[in-house]
A protein has these predicted regions:
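C-terminal motif of bacterial Sec signal peptides marking the signal peptidase cleavage site
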Residues: 20-22
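Bacterial N-terminal signal peptides that target proteins for export
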Residues: 2-12
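Non-catalytic cap/lid and distal C-terminal segments of serine-dependent acyl enzymes
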Residues: 24-259
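Residue-level signal for mature regions of secreted extracellular proteins and peptides
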Residues: 16-17
Length: 259
């Protein structure tokens, strides 16, 4: 059976129905995880910071260059090397995403001695920035989550009904995330990080007002410090995400520290 990634609806991002299920065989997850790199020109000093891009569902590592993200970063003349991970849905479906990203992409790159590691991802990749950071808090300096998928609507409605993330009565921490608990655990972790109760990266969020995920993303926005959310007119698409990336590259701790 051939399954088109782009034909899968956004609801398929509900990993609770995909992790460790038979349907995972429809979504490839090659080992090692493939990646594409863009390094500083040889004439420049060694880059201080590493950016790891994580694609959305149906996208691939090369899209970050093809759709202008790499050029946008280069335009700002930052001390940055970039690598895009081909972190497709199959890795999430098999629950191997954090391990493969660490082993195949992040650790080999970090061996070069970067001072900071930043993750940038959209939609499924936005979730990935948080999913990975929860288990690697000491390694990740910060993230830019663009229109991240943050679980099913019923959960975000529950959080909203309780007054938002700050007042939500979340579950106890779990040691191992799986398809049954990852959504609540991500939100619980976000609550703990934004309260200063657990270590975590410097979180930045960007999304368009007309994005299909805006109602859940605004719950996270309300819990972040001032200046850590970029909100513009736009939808769930690369055009909007590229503008949001530009805002982040102009005004963020990343922009200030990776020069």
């Amino acid at each position: 059976m051939i399954v088109s990634m782009r034909a899968v609806s956004l609801s398929a991002l509900a990993l609770s129905s995909l992790v460790l299920c038979a349907c995972a065989r429809w979504f490839p997850a090659p080992v090692p995880m493939r990646s594409v790199e863009w390094a500083q020109p040889a004439a420049k000093p060694r880059a201080r910071c590493l950016v790891v891009f994580l694609p959305g569902m149906g996208d691939d590592a090369e899209d970050f260059e093809r759709l202008g993200f790499v050029a946008e970063v280069k335009k700002h003349d930052l001390s940055v090397d970039m690598v895009a991970a081909h972190a497709t849905l199959g890795y999430y479906a098999r629950a191997t995403f954090p391990e493969r990203l660490a082993t195949d992409v992040v650790e080999p790159a970090r061996a070069r001695g970067y001072e900071q590691l930043w993750l940038i991802g959209m939609s499924l990749g936005g979730l990935g920035t948080l999913y990975y950071s929860r288990g690697h808090a000491a390694d990740v300096t910060g993230v830019l989550a663009l229109a991240p998928y943050l679980g099913e609507r019923e959960l975000s409605d529950e959080i909203r009904a309780q007054g938002g993330l700050a007042s939500w009565h979340g579950p106890p921490r779990v040691d191992v995330m799986n398809g049954n608990n990852y959504q609540r655990e991500i939100w619980r972790w976000l609550q703990a990080v934004t309260r200063g109760q657990e270590p975590g990266p410097n979180i930045y969020l960007g999304y368009g007002r007309d994005d299909k995920l805006a109602r859940q993303d605004e719950l996270l926005a309300a819990a972040l410090p001032e200046g850590h959310t970029y909100l513009i007119d736009g939808a769930h698409d690369w055009t909007t995400w590229k503008v949001l990336l530009g805002r982040f590259l102009q005004s963020s701790d990343f922009a200030r520290s990776c020069r």
